[in-house]
């Protein structure tokens, strides 16, 4: 499956989603690895198998096996970090911020791809998961590395488009097998 195949599964009410998905491969402010890694990381972050499989199929010809694995690693490690750090940030009891996390996250230090690309994928996933602390941390690293605000915004926009595709599928019943009964 690909973006084109995914679009055919979207309902009529999701015309804007289809148009936004169509524009993704033409995005030119990011490198090929950055863009296609975003498709994979954000696709898996939706937790929608149809979306994840379609975007991985679209991205695979453009990514090395190491980059494909790193994009999946960004989705999985941020799933953990976003829950944990969103809790420590939002909890009224600030003592939680002083406790050691005791979470293994060595992939962040050695992702197997350019660290800037991994940070960009992590930022988009963090935006999708709503972790303000992680968003700020990744955005600061990316700005320090020289990425522009427009490039950072593009990454988050890609995540937003992908999230909207998953919701459109689910709203149409494609993501809930029990809805077909």
Swiss-Prot record:
It is an enzyme of class 1 (oxidoreductase). Disulfide bonds join 131-134. Its EC number is 1.11.1.28. GO terms for molecular function: alkyl hydroperoxide reductase activity; disulfide oxidoreductase activity; hydroperoxide reductase activity; peroxiredoxin activity. It comes from the Bacteria. InterPro entries: AhpD, AhpD-like, AhpD_core, CMD-like. GO terms for biological process: cell redox homeostasis; response to oxidative stress. Pfam families: CMD. It catalyses: N(6)-[(R)-dihydrolipoyl]-L-lysyl-[lipoyl-carrier protein] + a hydroperoxide = N(6)-[(R)-lipoyl]-L-lysyl-[lipoyl-carrier protein] + an alcohol + H2O. The active site is at residues 131, 134. Keywords: Antioxidant, Disulfide bond, Oxidoreductase, Peroxidase, Redox-active center. Antioxidant protein with alkyl hydroperoxidase activity. Required for the reduction of the AhpC active site cysteine residues and for the regeneration of the AhpC enzyme activity. PANTHER family: ALKYL HYDROPEROXIDE REDUCTASE AHPD. Belongs to the AhpD family. This is Alkyl hydroperoxide reductase AhpD. It comes from Azorhizobium caulinodans (strain ATCC 43989 / DSM 5975 / JCM 20966 / LMG 6465 / NBRC 14845 / NCIMB 13405 / ORS 571). The lineage of its organism: Bacteria, Pseudomonadati, Pseudomonadota, Alphaproteobacteria, Hyphomicrobiales.
